[in-house]
């Protein structure tokens, strides 16, 4: 790894936002492209964080601070990535379904997907089916990632899928679901395209769904 990218990688791994921000600024001053900083510094670090989470070495707090550190760097890079015409892998609309106010898990999913190179449109929590549809229409997103943390709100997942069918948009968008009570069997039953048990897996499944 380029010596200039090492502090950025380590800063994300350690959840040290100052280290990431200083590293990004130093790399840019040394004429490293925003794309290289993102794809060779930050994205590999978030992938490693996801791997350590899956292996039980890292837990949710480590994921959160790593993602926050990465966001500090992304805030600097975003306008530069646009001017370099670096395209995201895909666009994902995220949200917790109608009636459900939980958003920590959904936020983590968004952060891990950003780390994998996706553009994220976060609708927040308590999102109605028509809000998901409007966001996809407006953004041209290829993927919708919905979460539910309560068994009572899970029923709003098939309702959202049906709304996409009724709008004639089901074939043009992939739907990924997750959340504590959600299972692969439930995803299969309601006709979702993918299921992820946690944020790290969500980013991996998203990559397979858009490719």
What does each model-found stretch correspond to?
Residues 1-84:
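Long amphipathic alpha-helical segments
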Residues 1, 84-87, 137, 167-169:
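Solvent-exposed alpha-helices and their adjacent loops that cap or buttress functional pockets
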Residues 196-197:
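Ligand-binding pocket scaffold of soluble enzyme catalytic domains
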Residues 43, 98-100, 126, 181:
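Short glycine-enriched loops at secondary-structure junctions
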Residues 20, 56, 102, 113, ...:
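Conserved, mostly hydrophobic/aromatic
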Residues 109-116, 121-192, 201, 205-207:
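Cofactor-cradling patches in redox/metallo enzymes
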Residues 88-123:
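Glycine-rich active-site/cofactor-binding loop and its immediate structural neighborhood
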């Amino acid at each position: 790894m380029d010596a200039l990218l090492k502090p950025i990688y380590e800063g994300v791994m350690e959840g040290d936002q100052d280290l990431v921000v200083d590293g990004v600024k130093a790399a840019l001053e040394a004429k490293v492209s925003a794309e290289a900083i993102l794809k060779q510094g930050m994205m590999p670090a978030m992938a490693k964080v996801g791997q350590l989470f899956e292996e039980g070495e890292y837990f949710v707090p480590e994921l959160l601070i790593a993602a926050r550190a990465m966001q500090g760097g992304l805030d600097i890079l975003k306008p530069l990535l646009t001017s370099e015409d670096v395209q995201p892998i895909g666009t994902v609309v995220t949200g917790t379904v109608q009636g459900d106010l939980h958003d920590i898990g959904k936020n983590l999913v968004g952060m891990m997907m950003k780390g994998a190179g996706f553009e994220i449109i976060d609708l927040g929590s308590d999102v109605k089916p028509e809000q998901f549809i409007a966001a996809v229409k407006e953004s041209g997103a290829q993927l919708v990632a919905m979460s539910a943390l309560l068994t009572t709100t899970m029923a709003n997942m098939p309702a959202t899928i049906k709304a996409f069918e009724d709008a004639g948009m089901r074939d043009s968008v992939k739907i990924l679901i997750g959340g504590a009570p959600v299972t692969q069997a439930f995803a299969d039953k309601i006709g979702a395209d993918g299921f992820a048990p946690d944020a790290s897996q969500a980013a991996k499944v998203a990559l397979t769904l858009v490719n």
